[in-house]
């Protein structure tokens, strides 16, 4: 089995013909956050991905195998929420509230995109946005800090999310119980906050 153990820096320009001939490894966002991964190229070949801890792969990245061959990374379509608003201020408010909850968000021209979450979808609709579940590649913003950062869910996060859950439960006639007394103090790579949507911890 070949091992993909190097990522070519984004500022290094490769010949387009080389990249075009490279096989593709299509991965969802959670998989692109993992530094150790068993995966299958689109050609059907099984490979091992072994990268420095904290590496977050993006669509279009190029990896180098231990035999010198190139492999191109593609972001796989996955279930996401596409968020739009009638005015920029409403969309900005939505982005603020999502950021306050440490939610990975892709920011585009007139839209936000996040992993599917019924509690957050309900909150976003209450803020006045239009929320549409769809299947699309997900590429959230990289973190503002250069290296991996360490944090747990603080009291503000727990209170905010508990309130969101309560509102969701009242609106839908049922509630979702999610414990937050377990430890979340672990390392993440830059911009990689998967598993911190409050109730989907892997």
Swiss-Prot record:
Pfam families found in the cross-reference section: UreE_C, UreE_N
Places the protein is found: Cytoplasm
One Gene Ontology molecular-function label: nickel cation binding
Xref: InterPro entries: UreE (IPR012406), UreE_C_dom (IPR007864), UreE_N (IPR004029), UreE_N_sf (IPR036118)
Cell membrane in keyword set: no
UniProtKB keywords: Chaperone, Cytoplasm, Nickel, Nickel insertion
GO BP annotation list: protein folding; protein-containing complex assembly; urea metabolic process
HAMAP family, alphabetized: UreE
Cited function: Involved in urease metallocenter assembly. Binds nickel. Probably functions as a nickel donor during metallocenter assembly.
Protein name: Urease accessory protein UreE
Gene symbol of the encoding locus: ureE
């Amino acid at each position: 089995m070949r091992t993909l153990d190097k990522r070519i820096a984004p500022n290094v320009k490769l010949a387009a013909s080389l990249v075009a001939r490279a096989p593709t490894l299509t991965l969802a966002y959670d998989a692109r956050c993992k530094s150790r991964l068993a995966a299958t190229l689109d050609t059907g070949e099984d490979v091992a991905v072994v990268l420095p801890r904290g590496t977050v792969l993006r669509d279009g990245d190029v990896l180098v195998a231990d035999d010198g061959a190139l492999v191109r990374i593609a972001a796989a379509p996955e279930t996401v929420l596409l968020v739009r608003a009638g005015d920029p201020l409403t969309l900005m408010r939505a982005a603020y509230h999502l950021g306050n909850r440490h939610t990975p968000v892709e920011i585009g021209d007139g839209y936000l995109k996040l992993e599917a979450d019924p509690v957050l979808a309900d909150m976003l609709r209450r803020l006045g946005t239009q929320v549409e579940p769809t299947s699309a590649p997900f590429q959230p913003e990289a973190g503002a800090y250069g290296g991996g950062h360490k944090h747990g869910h603080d009291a503000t996060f727990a209170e905010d999310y508990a309130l969101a859950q309560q509102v969701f439960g009242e609106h839908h006639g049922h509630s979702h119980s999610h414990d937050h007394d377990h430890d979340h103090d672990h390392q993440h790579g830059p911009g990689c906050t998967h598993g911190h949507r409050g109730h989907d911890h892997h």
